[in-house]
């Protein structure tokens, strides 16, 4: 059986060519991430075109995710591009626009001198370098280096515990969001989500642009952890972005936040991505550490829909080897491991139908579960149950097919609109009997809505034998 957990790859200089992206798709990339913290609009547009071309050449559904920078606080630029801060040194972080030196560098957060107070921590580059505020002098925050290390242009700064006042969407984010929607991306990821209301800000701009796509909440702030379930309900999917999360909340809490987020997302049929430093050592090395292999496998066994690669594919030495390695780890975890069953009891019609379809298919030892969907909702409700049976999803909507590239286990087929159950079964026969792994007489359990084409109308389970016009059950 094909790998069920999806792989998200961040695009960047290491794969910035038509051939590089085609090879990523062939290696196993399911979703391409355009990181708007780096690159410019022409770069992202070119990568977008290459992904669409690669998907067409391979016949695979490949989603494209635009990841907005969000109100990320960063250092400015250094005259020499980089420097190394040693323990005990005094560094001035200024809100003035200056060319950075070893001792003084600017920040993008213009209220820092107002908000900072002695004792506050400033963590640079996902916490690799640590500073403590000693005093504030005018526009400069005077800091002592308590954890030294290299720093370079535009590195991120986290301010754990500091009450900061930044909007959910910066002016840059709004420009990038409008550009990404016009470009045609399949998902928008919103960084540093703090409240369920943040989703409404994105939806407002989407409505102005006349195009709605799924919005992914990146869980990186303590406020998001506190409001985890309301945020999951307000957004279409979630990403456990462990880099910033691990410096904003105590490091030891991150594994349990990951497990809680996955559990809540599964209960609500929302796709969930686990991200950051999954195979980080492979940016430089040809093999991952044992801890990294365990990390990927545990994300799979927690029930994640997707695992994400960042610098490993965007700037790594051998991005193709990284994707193949991750795919092997995932496959082995899926083959010999087991995802815990959902303890959540469904109380909606669609939820109960999806549970029942899974149970019927497994009890009858069917060859596969088949879902017909116009919105993707039916497929997501079946996928969250993590059946050992293949999940084959038919949709007449190209955008939904791309969206389901992020959903666990979903193998998608684009089909013409169907008008009744007989049409559905003909489409199933046409597609599956052309595949070597399926034969006439194979049993399929089909879950769909009747009449077809009505969003949110999942109300039918149908047991079908491939190539057989006689329906043996309709429940």
From Swiss-Prot:
EC number from the UniProt entry: 2.7.1.40
Obligatory cofactor(s): Mg(2+); K(+)
Residues annotated as binding Mg(2+): 220, 244
Catalytic activity: pyruvate + ATP = phosphoenolpyruvate + ADP + H(+)
Site (Transition state stabilizer): residue numbering on this chain: 218
Keywords: ATP-binding, Glycolysis, Kinase, Magnesium, Metal-binding, Nucleotide-binding, Potassium, Pyruvate, Transferase
Residues that hold ATP according to the record: 35-38, 74, 155
GO molecular function: ATP binding; kinase activity; magnesium ion binding; potassium ion binding; pyruvate kinase activity
Signal peptide: none
Binding site for substrate: 33, 243-244, 276
Pfam families: PK (PF00224), PK_C (PF02887)
Pathway(s) where this gene product acts: Carbohydrate degradation; glycolysis; pyruvate from D-glyceraldehyde 3-phosphate: step 5/5
Chain sites annotated for binding K(+): 35, 37, 67
Similarity-based family: Belongs to the pyruvate kinase family.
Protein name: Pyruvate kinase
Organism in which the protein naturally occurs: Corynebacterium glutamicum (strain ATCC 13032 / DSM 20300 / JCM 1318 / BCRC 11384 / CCUG 27702 / LMG 3730 / NBRC 12168 / NCIMB 10025 / NRRL B-2784 / 534)
Highest classification ranks of the organism: Bacteria, Bacillati, Actinomycetota, Actinomycetes, Mycobacteriales
